[in-house]
Amino acid sequence: MPRVEKIIPVWGTEIYIDASSSKIDATEIDRVIAGVEAFLFDVDEELSTFKENSSVSKLRANKLKIEDAPDMVQEVWRGCAKAKELSFGSFDPWAVEGGFDPSGFVKGWAAEKAAVMLVSAGCDQVQVNAAGDIALRGKEPWKIGVVNPDNKSEIVQVFEITNGNIATSGHYEKGAHIKDPHTGVIAIGAKSGTVIGPDGGICDALATALMVDGQDAAQWIGNPELSEYTFWSINRHENSAWSHGPNLGLAK
């Protein structure tokens, strides 16, 4: 079965794509990945907080109203609002300095969009890894490991995911810079937070919320709207972890 792997440098990081297909050949997979690459650069142009002419920068500068923004931007705005609601405000892209910053949602959201593009074009087995926010599709499960935030050479948990998304937030992923939107100071809830579920953007955002709340996330993870999501978190001050949800991972 033809398989193509590619690394795309964008958003100041690298996006890894692994796509296989029993329906189309490697040349066609390459063509589809080129379309995905164009989409990822469009995301950067519209949603970057670093590009002065992006729609997000214009929103932050009050030079654009959300109702006048491109559909992509409005979709992300709505997704961020939903994640804020689900997390009781522990994910809040409006609480950051300078105004609306969807960075904690966009990687997971875009990875899922890219995976859908690849599957729609005929790929059977797909992984899109946007710097730790991963979208997975396939007939066979993918094994995804979570790294120990205190020892990057150690895998502390493994999840099998066939069709879904996984996002991890921790000190190895700029965790020291995650602020608690309720207090404005550095988040001290958890050492690492992982979320698995059907929506990549929501996984990305709620992994950040886990870092903020730690075990206090118990107040919102039981929401019936999150019944398809799995949460796995390493406690900050104890050598222990806890989990909630349908995919409890593989014992290490």
Predicted regions and their residues:
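Mature catalytic core of soluble alpha/beta enzymes
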Residues: M1-K252
